[in-house]
């Protein structure tokens, strides 16, 4: 890619969208496909120098992103079109740059973030889908989305999420602050929309797994509050599948003035 190299160092933020179904998660790892590795390779081609990216949230194998944010530093002076159209031309079809923004030195994709937002998409129908099969989680028993929504409201605010935390979670604390959790139905789709300052490992998928039990009338509405109070992962339901989970937005202080495109996923109304 033609362009100038300079003695100055530029810090660039990008919005990234990806279908995680064919990747072993976000994080670069030896001998397996990762979103980070593909993005760094494409950026390095455009920058004509090695690029390392830092992301807002490392998603697991099979999990998707419509609102992932990354930053990197480079001495390459390029037009915005090079960092969007140029990088996209070098990326696989299931990863895309959505926007680019030059950011100040004190910006960090992970540490400057004030909140993350996820959406979990359930295809609630007797028969499984074929199109979008890796972009939704199929659940065949009828679900009561309003019941799920009511049950979930006990999770609001600052709580100990041990009951919804993966055993292998490496976070120093199970405490997180949930800002909203909404469960809504859109035809055959049931959407769990949750925003928090941060998430413990598998937190969204573990919450959804238990909400499915409530929605199917296998557990009472009070069960989620009981699980939260118990602080015991073994009492909660199985972890919901990765396919339905999307990182849809990351919040930053207004002073960074980052773009805010529609959250998606694109087959859902915003």
From Swiss-Prot:
GO terms for molecular function: pseudouridine synthase activity; RNA binding; tRNA pseudouridine(38-40) synthase activity. Substrate binds at residue 118. It holds the Pfam family PseudoU_synth_1. One of its GO terms (biological process) is tRNA pseudouridine synthesis. It is an enzyme of class 5 (isomerase). It comes from the Bacteria. Its EC number is 5.4.99.12. InterPro entries: PsdUridine_synth_cat_dom_sf, PsdUridine_synth_TruA, PsdUridine_synth_TruA_a/b_dom, PsdUridine_synth_TruA_C, TruA/RsuA/RluB/E/F_N. Gene3D superfamilies: Pseudouridine synthase I, catalytic domain, C-terminal subdomain, Pseudouridine synthase I, catalytic domain, N-terminal subdomain. The active site is at residue 60. SUPFAM superfamilies: Pseudouridine synthase. Keywords: Isomerase, tRNA processing. It catalyses: uridine(38/39/40) in tRNA = pseudouridine(38/39/40) in tRNA. Homodimer. Formation of pseudouridine at positions 38, 39 and 40 in the anticodon stem and loop of transfer RNAs. Belongs to the tRNA pseudouridine synthase TruA family. This is tRNA pseudouridine synthase A. It comes from Salmonella typhimurium (strain LT2 / SGSC1412 / ATCC 700720).
């Amino acid at each position: 890619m033609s362009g100038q190299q300079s003695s100055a160092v530029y810090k660039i933020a990008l919005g990234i969208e990806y279908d995680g179904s064919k990747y072993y998660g976000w994080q670069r790892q030896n001998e397996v496909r990762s979103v980070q590795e593909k993005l760094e390779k494409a950026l390095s081609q455009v920058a004509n120098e090695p690029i390392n990216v830092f992301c807002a949230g490392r998603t697991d194998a099979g999990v998707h992103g419509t609102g992932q944010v990354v930053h990197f530093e480079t001495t390459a002076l390029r037009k915005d079109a090079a960092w969007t159209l140029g990088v996209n031309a070098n990326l696989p079809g299931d990863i895309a740059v959505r926007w680019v923004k030059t950011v100040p030195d004190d910006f960090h994709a992970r540490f400057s973030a004030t909140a993350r937002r996820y959406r979990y998409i359930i295809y609630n129908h007797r028969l499984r889908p074929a199109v979008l099969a890796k972009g939704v989680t199929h659940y065949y028993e009828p679900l009561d989305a309003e019941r799920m929504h009511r049950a979930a409201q006990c999770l609001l605010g600052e709580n100990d999420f041990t009951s919804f935390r993966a055993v292998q979670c490496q976070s120093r604390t199970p405490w997180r602050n949930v800002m909203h959790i909404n469960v809504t139905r859109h035809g055959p789709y049931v959407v769990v929309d949750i925003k928090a300052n941060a998430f413990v490992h598998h937190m969204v998928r573990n919450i959804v797994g238990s909400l499915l039990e409530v929605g199917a009338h296998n557990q009472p509405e009070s069960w989620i509050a009981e699980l939260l109070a118990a602080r015991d992962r073994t009492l909660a339901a199985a972890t919901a599948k990765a396919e339905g989970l999307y990182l849809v937005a990351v919040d930053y202080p207004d002073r960074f003035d980052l773009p805010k495109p529609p959250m998606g996923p694109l087959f859902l109304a915003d």
